[in-house]
Amino acid sequence: TETNWSNYNNFEFASGHQANLNWQSSTSFAEEGKRKSVLQYFDGSLRNRQTVTKDNTTNTTVVAESLYDYQGRPVIQVLPSPTINTIIKLTPNFNNFLNSSAYYKDNYDKILPGNDYCNGAAPALDAGKGGTAQYYSPQNPGKDAGNNKLIPDAKGFPYTETRYLQDNTGRVAAQGGVGPDHRLNSGHETKYFYSGADQSELDALFGTEAGDAPHYFKNMVRDANGQYSVSYLDMHGRTIATALAGDLPASAKLDYLPSKQDSYLTKE
């Protein structure tokens, strides 16, 4: 049964949090009064550009950023890193590329002279201007404090980068990892290949149960170690078969399975 309301008041919000920006707040609560607040800031196209949360242990904020190409596709995901701020808010120009005052799209969505699209990659971030690049570098002012001694040096590449096929399908062509040894064009990026399935391959896999080859797709992925894996998909995008392919990567200290047999197929 509802009882009488003892007290009630009217509250008016005079001004909201950074009212000139697009943002969304999410707060999670746990036992013993624990809570976690995360704010996402969006640009004019409502794409998430910066995510800010708070480290309740150090009472400082942690910032992560996403960068997009001219077609609005997510290209660069910068690792989260702590700041010296104690208030959750947008930090403009938190990450900057070398020789640039801001992260213009031309820094990573532009073909430089002497290169082609397949060999293009984003430059390093400038550790001298702060941000994530400074945190993952010898220029980190707190590098000698406690566990900070174990923070790796990203050498200006504390981000992952995605390259897309130039066919307007939005399919990924390659994806680099964090650090200089796994970035795009390092030889350790993940590459993706797309093709149609061959009828002879389907017959070998499924025998008389195989359908017509035009109804199937064959995709291949080369991981950071150089190992290829193949997936066969039906017209609904469902995976119907997977397999490893190619020779063992030179870096892999493994033996072939006893069942491995080489076979050759000649096509016209």
Write out the residue ranges for each language-model feature.
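Beta-strand elements of repeat-based all-beta scaffolds
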Residues: 1-268
